[in-house]
Amino acid sequence: MSTGTVVQVIGAVVDVEFPQDAVPQVYDALKITGEGSCNGLVLEVQQQLGGGVVRTIAMGTSDGLRRGLEVVNSGSPISVPVGTATLGRIMNVLGEPIDEAGAIGEEERYVIHRSAPSYEDQSNTTELLETGIKVIDLVCPFAKGGKVGLFGGAGVGKTVNMMELINNIAKAHSGLSVFAGVGERTREGNDFYYEMKDSGVLDKVAMVYGQMNEPPGNRLRVALTGLTMAEKFRDEGRDVLLFVDNIYRYTLAGTEVSALLGRMPSAVGYQPTLAEEMGVLQERITSTKTGSITSVQAVYVPADDLTDPSPATTFAHLDATVVLSRQIASLGIYPAVDPLDSTSRQLDPLVVGQEHYDVANGVQTVLQRYKELKDIIAILGMDELSDDDKMTVSRARKIERFLSQPFHVAEVFTGSPGKYVSLKDTIRGFKGILSGEFDHIPEQAFYMVGSIDEAVEKANKKK
């Protein structure tokens, strides 16, 4: 346990001098001791500058920090509580409780910097995970133990979609979940807590928050804290769900830290180590022969530009991508998932079966044709189309509306009860629309319903 002193403070970056023979290693956690508001503040070593000086990032506010304060080296990276004691609790990046419900009472702590499982230990299964959301189950099905990205600009429903997935999967799958709130709004974290409490699944969720108002160090490391807790459950042989909201803020925190450390920025001002930082996190989110981690990550898309380096780097790591479109949201169709832009490696006849594959393909073909015809309709009107094209447009409009669905977590806003639709019902409904079985039903009947039976019932009521 060597001690050093603070020699320079620049915002969240703190330089600490140690004796030459006891310099801390990179990623070691240091603790400020002594009087004042900064007592107990944790610093993480980022660089060794030579001459016994290390450059660190503060894991908390550096207000009141001054030169000359004593710093103690813990001799190991930041460690956080793991295991069942974390369930139902809200913690910060250091694993300290922030829900005013007393100590965590953990039996074990893990360090947050760990290596990814080796090739031999990783497993590759293709078991499907039913979400109960029609558009996702049909067009971009999730794999158990896979990685899913929810891509979308500001305000198109990433968090609501994620909350619905947690609600549906946590109830149906009754597994354990870890939720990492990375640089998001505190209000959303609060909503999430009460949502879980009301639906009775709070005792199955561990929550780790490093929100928007916190220093960049917290936001950069909080995803690793959540992941470490998920890894412990996986290593115990459980199937765990990891939700990260929002992975873009993780990148952004890395950009801030990189700039504070004086590194030269790369494309669009991002850190030069963007791909490596993303890889360090994503490579650890994997399933082993003992247990699985299924992860759902919300990805904010700056200015709706999917070619921005941050979302583009994230794409490479995912098995399924759910793209939320502002255009679809503006039509009032929620969830605003773009069925032509969303993809999944699982959408393969060998995995999902021939029927599912054909129906999904048919839906995409009809919607693509409708997209091409929109220009003609805008210029010449519907009357100029051939009978086949008129039928395609009619079915496409029904499919578009049938892709909408009332959510459980949005009941307060929509006023209509949420619906969980099984994969069997989803395929049956879309297959019927494609085959012309429901050509006699008006398109309004397909809007905001669960299964196809509800659409038929709605149409009969309107008669």
From Swiss-Prot:
Its main location: membrane. It is found in: Cell inner membrane. SMART domains: AAA. It is a peripheral membrane protein. One of its GO terms (cellular component) is proton-transporting ATP synthase complex. It is an enzyme of class 7 (translocase). InterPro entries: AAA+_ATPase (IPR003593), ATP-synt_VA_C (IPR055190), ATP_synth_F1_bsu (IPR005722), ATPase_a/bsu_AS (IPR020003), ATPase_alpha/beta_chains (IPR050053), ATPase_F1/V1/A1_a/bsu_N (IPR004100), ATPase_F1/V1/A1_a/bsu_N_sf (IPR036121), ATPase_F1/V1/A1_a/bsu_nucl-bd (IPR000194). F-type ATPases have 2 components, CF(1) - the catalytic core - and CF(0) - the membrane proton channel. CF(1) has five subunits: alpha(3), beta(3), gamma(1), delta(1), epsilon(1). CF(0) has three main subunits: a(1), b(2) and c(9-12). The alpha and beta chains form an alternating ring which encloses part of the gamma chain. CF(1) is attached to CF(0) by a central stalk formed by the gamma and epsilon chains, while a peripheral stalk is formed by the delta and b chains. Belongs to the ATPase alpha/beta chains family. Produces ATP from ADP in the presence of a proton gradient across the membrane. The catalytic sites are hosted primarily by the beta subunits. NCBIfam families: atpD (TIGR01039). This is ATP synthase subunit beta. It comes from Shewanella sp. (strain MR-7). The gene is atpD.
